[in-house]
Structures are given as structure tokens and as C-alpha cells.
């Protein structure tokens, strides 16, 4: 009789262990799904914030450009306009990264393309901020 109890208890333990393993796998996959959904939400919020900043920045740059167009332009003003146009092109390439990447990366292999994207992000943000600072400083200098 002891043998029957040992077999029955062993079977119960094995089935309980199998159920716990299955539950662990399900909870891990559910956790992965929840983490992925959280990341998507965070990326969505970041994209909305970045979109708002880009829109505001574009509006400010267009206003600055129209100010320079209406007045007399010196060589320095002409350089500032060129920089503003370059910044506007870079901002437009942020809005449509696939098209810009397609134009810039024809003939590159995948690793070079990945490196180009990270370099482009760094290349765009630095000059955009410095150009905007320079333009605003120049405007304040001219107004003051």
C-alpha cells in the first residue's frame, strides 16, 4: 500500500510542478507583452513631444526667415539665411526619415546605414541648437 501512496504523491507533485512551469512561462510572456506595450506608449509620448517641439521650432525658423527676407541683407544675414535653410531641410528630413535615408544611403550596406542613422541624429541636433542660438543672439544684437 505504501507503494501506491508514493506513486500517487509523486504523480501529484509532478503534475503540480508541470502546471507551475507552464504558469511561469505564461507569466513571462505576459510580462514581455506588457513591457513591449509600455515601451510603445513611451515611444508614442516621446514622438508626440518631439513633433510638438519640431513644429514650434519650424514656426520660429519660418518667422525668422521671413524677417530676414523683408529687410536688407548683408553678407552675414545671407549666411544666416543659408544656415536657416539647412536647418529647415534637416528638420524636414526628421519628419520623413525614410525618404531622406533612401536618398542618402543608396548603395550602402546595412551596417553603414545603421551607423549613418546614429551619426545623422548627432549631426542634426548639434548644429540645429547652435544655429538657433546664433540666430537668436544675432537678432537680439540687431534689436538691441
Swiss-Prot record:
Belongs to the bombinin family. It is found in: Secreted. The modification Leucine amide is found at residue 143. This is Maximins 7/H1. Maximin-7 shows antimicrobial activity against bacteria and against the fungus C.albicans. It has little hemolytic activity. Residues 19-43, 74-123 form a propeptide. Keywords: Amidation, Amphibian defense peptide, Antibiotic, Antimicrobial, Cleavage on pair of basic residues, Cytolysis, Fungicide, Hemolysis, Secreted, Signal. Pfam families: Bombinin. Coiled coil: none annotated. Residues 1-18 form the signal peptide.
Amino acid at each position: 500500500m505504501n507503494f501506491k501512496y508514493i506513486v500517487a504523491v509523486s504523480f501529484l507533485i509532478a503534475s503540480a510542478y508541470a502546471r507551475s512551469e507552464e504558469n511561469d512561462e505564461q507569466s513571462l510572456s505576459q510580462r514581455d507583452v506588457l513591457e513591449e506595450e509600455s515601451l510603445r506608449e513611451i515611444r508614442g509620448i516621446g514622438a508626440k513631444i518631439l513633433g510638438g517641439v519640431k513644429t514650434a521650432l519650424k514656426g520660429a525658423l519660418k518667422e525668422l526667415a521671413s524677417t530676414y527676407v523683408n529687410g536688407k541683407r548683408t553678407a552675414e544675414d545671407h549666411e544666416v539665411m543659408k544656415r536657416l535653410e539647412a536647418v529647415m531641410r534637416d528638420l524636414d528630413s526628421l519628419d520623413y526619415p525614410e525618404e531622406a535615408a533612401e536618398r542618402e544611403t543608396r548603395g550602402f550596406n546595412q551596417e553603414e546605414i545603421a551607423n549613418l542613422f546614429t551619426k545623422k541624429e548627432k549631426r542634426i541636433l548639434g548644429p540645429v541648437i547652435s544655429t538657433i542660438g546664433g540666430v537668436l543672439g544675432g537678432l537680439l544684437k540687431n534689436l538691441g
